[in-house]
Amino acid sequence: MHGVNDPPLFIKDIKAGLKNLNVVFIVLEIGRVTKTKDGHEVRSCKVADRTGSITISVWDEIGGLIQTGDIIRLTRGYASMWKGCLTLYTGRGGELQKIGEFCMVYSEVPNFSEPNPDYRGQQNRGVQNEQKDKLSTNTFGPVGNGDQTGPESRGYHLPYGRSNGPGPISPQLPGTPSSQTVRTTISNARDPRRAFKR
C-alpha cells in the first residue's frame, strides 16, 4: 500500500488491485460524459506522465472541472481492470488536486489502458498465461514476473549499445580472465526467419 505522504508513483508502476495510490499526471484528453443508471456523470480522461499514459475515470462534478493541460495530483486513488483495460479511479476519500498547467514532460506511449487480451483470457479461463514464460527465455533483465535473470541479477551491470565501431559491447565480468570475452545477446523473441526483406 502507498501512503498519502509517499512520493508519487509512476504510471508504468500502476497495477490492477493497487490502492492508496499517489500519482501526478497531465490531462491529455477528456472523454465525453456518460450517465449511469443512478444519474451519476462519468468521464474517462487520458492522462500521462513521463513513463506512459493511462485512463482515469472521474465521476460527477469534479469531471466537469478538469481541463486538457491540467497537471493533477491524485491522492488515495486505486487501479482496477474495466472491460480488460487498466483504469485509474479516485475512489472514496480520493482527491484530485490541480497543481499546475501545461508544463510537464510526458509520454503517450505505452498506453497502459489499451485492452489487454492476456488479462481477459486469464479471467475467462482462470489460468496463467504461459506464453510470457516462453518468451522470456534466453534474455537478460526483467522478465514477465519481475524477476531478473542473467548477470544483472547478481549485481553486475552490462552496458548495452555500441562502443566505437559495429558490434555488441563485450563487457568484462568480475572473476573472468581478461582474454575471455562475454557476448551479450539481446533477443526480442522474434523468429529471425521472418525478418523484413529488402
From Swiss-Prot:
Tell me the PANTHER family matching this sequence: OB FOLD NUCLEIC ACID BINDING PROTEIN-RELATED, SOSS COMPLEX SUBUNIT B2
> What residues are annotated to bind DNA?
26-89
- Might you name a Gene Ontology BP term for this protein? DNA repair
What's the family?
Answer: Belongs to the SOSS-B family. SOSS-B2 subfamily.
List the lineage, top down: Eukaryota, Metazoa, Chordata, Craniata, Vertebrata
What name does this protein carry? SOSS complex subunit B2
Q: Species name for this entry?
A: Mus musculus
The tissues in which it is expressed are:
Ubiquitous with high expression in the thymus.
Listed as disulfide-bonded, the cysteine pairs are none
Amino acid composition bias (Polar residues), ranges on this chain: 136-151, 173-188
* Main localization (coarse): nucleus
Q: Does the keyword DNA-binding apply?
A: yes
Drop me one GO molecular function for this one: single-stranded DNA binding
GO terms under cellular component: chromosome, telomeric region; cytosol; nucleoplasm; nucleus; site of double-strand break; SOSS complex
CDD domains per UniProt: SoSSB_OBF (cd04491)
Q: Which UniProt keywords apply?
A: DNA damage, DNA repair, DNA-binding, Nucleus
UniProt subcellular location:
Nucleus
Q: Kindly state the subunit structure of this protein.
A: Component of the SOSS complex, composed of SOSS-B (SOSS-B1/NABP2 or SOSS-B2/NABP1), SOSS-A/INTS3 and SOSS-C/INIP. SOSS complexes containing SOSS-B1/NABP2 are more abundant than complexes containing SOSS-B2/NABP1.
| Regions crossing the membrane | none
Organism superkingdom? Eukaryota
Q: What does this protein do?
A: Component of the SOSS complex, a multiprotein complex that functions downstream of the MRN complex to promote DNA repair and G2/M checkpoint. In the SOSS complex, acts as a sensor of single-stranded DNA that binds to single-stranded DNA, in particular to polypyrimidines. The SOSS complex associates with DNA lesions and influences diverse endpoints in the cellular DNA damage response including cell-cycle checkpoint activation, recombinational repair and maintenance of genomic stability.
Q: Residues annotated as region Disordered?
A: 114-198
Q: Which InterPro entries match?
A: NA-bd_OB-fold, SOSS-B
